[in-house]
Structure formats: structure tokens, C-alpha cells
Amino acid sequence: MASEDVKRTESAAVSTIVNLAEEAREGVKAPSYAFKSICKSLFAGGVAGGVSRTAVAPLERMKILLQVQNPHNIKYSGTVQGLKHIWRTEGLRGLFKGNGTNCARIVPNSAVKFFSYEQASNGILYMYRQRTGNENAQLTPLLRLGAGATAGIIAMSATYPMDMVRGRLTVQTANSPYQYRGIAHALATVLREEGPRALYRGWLPSVIGVVPYVGLNFSVYESLKDWLVKENPYGLVENNELTVVTRLTCGAIAGTVGQTIAYPLDVIRRRMQMVGWKDASAIVTGEGRSTASLEYTGMVDAFRKTVRHEGFGALYKGLVPNSVKVVPSIAIAFVTYEMVKDVLGVEFRISD
């Protein structure tokens, strides 16, 4: 009897341990799965950002050069002429100058942005359903705008110092008297000569521009997708899935709307980033004279001086290469993001 009691006790103990082990596995299964999904989502966002920016790097550099060009010492009269000039004077590498820094910035920026949007969307949707009492409620375009803007501000703020020095690296040429040797050297030089606040010059117009630019990109794209799936015009949807061409079109439309609304703020941001730089007076001026030092006391002052000395049209300098590059750039980013997530087996998407 004693031996049987011992066996029963041992059996019960083993059973208890097995049950505890099973419960432990079940307890960590969901968080572990969620963590893997998050990592895959971050990776997909990084790949999307890097691929899309590299594809349009020459147009991106041309846009920035036109935005900050000295109106009294015009070197680039247009997009085509500017690209030819860069090819002739700097070669193939000149067309991609600053792209390495841009990729170093855009990969974490895109990863954080896409991930933040998904988390913000889930949080906002949860609160919206709790408030309305409707468990089947979906995000409205306005709520998507809020989620997109939140994601954009978080991502932009986290990587802004890299964007600031990227702007200067992109603008400098082989003839610039003082050369930044790379992103690390540029960051160190700005910190030493201009102080840490200099790394966030132009941050305010960037934050303001995030709302219409990133917010509209996401909300327009997602709203178009939902409408197409629901209405299926011209048979564009197959098995409740959009084709790659349809996704590309949605991304292109979303990108065009966002960049058109926010573009003047982007011009002012770039000009403010040049303040305090030794080469700035040779690139762009704030007082309307080619030899004047570039000085803006803030965003409003930058707007005022730009319009006063160069006219309202100066706020749209570089719009042509930006329009050409932003459509494929945004479209490729969205499509690449979802395709990479499909390959990695991530179940939730931006639209979920």
C-alpha cells in the first residue's frame, strides 16, 4: 500500500510538473510569437525604406540642391540640366551622394514609422471600439490620419540628427572648401562647432509637415485599399486581395497628395539645416545677397526672408524632381513592405 501511495504521489507530481510546463509554454507562446512578428514587421519596414530611397537617390539629391540653391549664383536651372551637370562634374557617384547616409537614416526611420503606425492604429482602434461600444468598428480616415501623424513624428524625431547632416552631405560638392568625410564626421563636426541644438535645426517645420505628409500618405492609401476591396471597380480585386499594380497606384496617389500639401515646409526645413554651416553662404542666402551669411531666427523668419527675396515660387523649388521621385518612392515602399511581410509570414498588415 505504501509503495502504491508513493507511486500515486510521484505520478501526481509528474502530472503537475507536466501541466505547469504546458501552462508556461502557453503563457510565453503568444508574447514570443508577437515579438517575432514585431521583429519581422520592423525588418520589412527597413527594407521598404532602403529600397525605395535608393531607387530615386539621384532625384532626391537634385531636389535638395534646387531647394537650397543660391538665387544669385544659379548652377542648376532645372532637373534634367542639373542631373547632366552632376554627371559631367562628379560622375556616377555624384548622383548618389548622400544616399548612404539616407539609407542609414531611412532604414530605422521606416522601420519605426511602419511599426509605430501599426501599434498606434491598434491602440486607437481599441479605444474607439471601447468608446462606441461597437466591437466591429473600424478606423475612420480621420483616425488613420492621427495614427499616421503619430508614427511620423516618432520616427522623424528619433532620426532627425541624421537627416540634418544628410542634407549637408548631399549639398556639398567636390569643390566645397570644407568637406564632411561621412555621417560620423559630420555629426561630430556639427556638435563641436555648432552645438547639439544645431542637430535639430528645422525640426519644427518637419513636425508640422508630418501631419499632412505622413498622415495623408497612410490614410489615403489605406482608405483607397478599403474602398477597392469593398467596391471592386473594374475587377481590380482578386480573392479580396489587391494586385501589385493596384497597390502601386494607391501608393502613388497617396504620395502625391501628401507631398503637395507639405512641400513648402520641406523647403524651409532644408534651408534652416544650412544655418551655421561654413559653406552655407556659397549655397543659399537669407538676406538676398550672394555674399551674405545665411541666418534665420526661426521658421517664420525663414518663410519671410525666402518669400521676400525670392518670391512665393521659391517655396516650391525642387518640386519637379520631388514629384517625379515621390510617386515611385512611396509606392515602392508600401508594396515592398507588404511583400516582405508576406514572404516572412507576418499575418497582420497595415490595413488590419
Swiss-Prot record:
Similarity annotation: Belongs to the mitochondrial carrier (TC 2.A.29) family.
Subcellular location: Mitochondrion inner membrane
Protein name: Mitochondrial adenine nucleotide transporter ADNT1
Phenotypic effect of disruption: Reduced root growth and respiration.
Tissue: Expressed in seedling radicles and roots, vasculature of cotyledons, leaf primordia, leaves and sepals.
One annotated GO molecular function: antiporter activity
Activity regulation annotation text: Inhibited by pyridoxal 5-phosphate, bathophenanthroline, mersalyl, p-hydroxymercuribenzoate and tannic acid.
Membrane topology: Multi-pass membrane protein
Gene: ADNT1
Function noted in UniProt: Mitochondrial adenylate carrier that catalyzes specifically the transport of ATP, ADP and AMP by a counter-exchange mechanism across the inner mitochondrial membrane. Substrate preference in reconstituted proteoliposomes is ATP > AMP > ADP. May play a role in oxidative phosphorylation and be important for the provision of energy required to support growth in heterotrophic tissues.
Recorded GO CC terms: mitochondrial inner membrane
